[in-house]
Structures are given as C-alpha cells and as structure tokens.
Amino acid sequence: MRELSAIHAWQAADPSVEIVNVDFVSGAGAVVERFEAARSVTFDGGVYTTVIAIRNMNSDRAARRLLAQFGGSASISDGGFNDVDYHSGEPWAPTDWTISSDSDSIEWFTDTFGVDPNANALRWSTMYTFWFDSTADPTMATYSLDLFKPGSPSSVTIPFSGMSPVIFTDGFESGDLTSWSSSTP
C-alpha cells in the first residue's frame, strides 16, 4: 500500500471494492484535476447496502454534491455521511451535508460556493464517505459529483463499471432455501 492513497487499503481488505478515477480538465487550463471514488455493494435479504468513499486528490474546485440516480423506482433508506472534523482555526464550516432521497435518487449536498465560500466542501486531500440501503441494484445507478467552485465543468460523472460486485443474487445468500431441491441444486 506504500505510495498509494488510503482508499486503496479498503480494496486490499475487500477485493470486491471498485476504485475509479474521476478526472477532468478545469476550464481552459491544462491541469487535470482528480477525485478517486470507491464503491462497495453488499446484498442481504433483498436489500443492497452501498458505501461510497470519495477522495479529492488535487482539485481546487472541490465537490459539493453527490447524486445517485436510479433508472426507476427504488426504496432508499438509511442514508449516512462521514466527513472531516475541522479544527485548530480552520475557516471551513463543520456542518454535515444534507441528505435527501425520493423514489429514484439519493443525494448529499452542502451549500454552493456562491452561498458560502467556506461551506463544508470536499476539499483537496480529504475523503468523505457516503452510504445508503436500497431495494434497487445500485450498480445500475448513475453517480455524479457537482463541483463546488464555479467553472466548467460544473459536474462530473463517476465512471463506476455498472457491473455488480455481488456474486450471488439468487436468494440463497439470505438463507432462504425454499427454491432449492435435490434435482436442481
């Protein structure tokens, strides 16, 4: 794990964790800014639990919103968030991001740069964690990250593969063996 960010330790401990880079060129400059995103999905008793960690590698523009958009109806619950506890006179607001969900999406967000330049954005060299439960397969959702400081682009897509890291989805992992028989193992 030497010379890698801490987010890679999660994948070393759990090989089902998917890590992707979210790169973009900010404005007309040639500077590539990068976020790293990792996702873990588990399935138990008809409910998917998704955990997402996002690390700001070098983006001065920071991030202010994460959106998971499902293609259809989903029952979404137990959304959570973990951030950095700023201290020692840091000017950044310590306010947790707001969590909002409806029938086909869940989002976490803080104020825009225009409202509060010191809002609790996902700033350079920090990592925030987000999680939720859903009845719809979260590997089929589209994930996007809105940037905090104004500029182009204003949002970037997180390129998770769309492939489910869940190996078995036939109901047996829940302990329900009612559809199993000796003729059809």
Where are these regions (language model features)?
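Low-complexity, acidic Ser/Thr/Pro/Gly-rich terminal tails and inter-domain linkers that flank the onset
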Residues: 2-45
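Solvent-exposed beta-hairpin/edge-strand motifs
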Residues: 63-94
